[in-house]
Amino acid sequence: MSSIREKTIAALDAAEASYRKLAALPLEALTRPDKQALLNRLEELDKKMTALDRRLIGQLVTEGDPALFGGAAWADVLSRRLRISRGEAQRRIAEARSA
């Protein structure tokens, strides 16, 4: 039986492979309605990915100490690890806490 870590990595690998396949397609060949439908599906997927991101951030900030990751605050850790601004990191943490 695979561990949850292995299953998570396999699922993420599959998602990345699917993205590469989609990105390689000649999207300019789609009709306008097809492009609109694709945009709708991508928006839905983006919302799901954002929700998962906030869930993980919420778990990190409630379960751990940012000092263990080399930061005085979680915003410092996330901004460094994710290469985002400290303000963006604070916004994501606030969203995670309110979810």
Place the predicted regions along the sequence by residue.
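Peripheral, non-cofactor segments flanking catalytic/redox cores
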Residues: 1-99
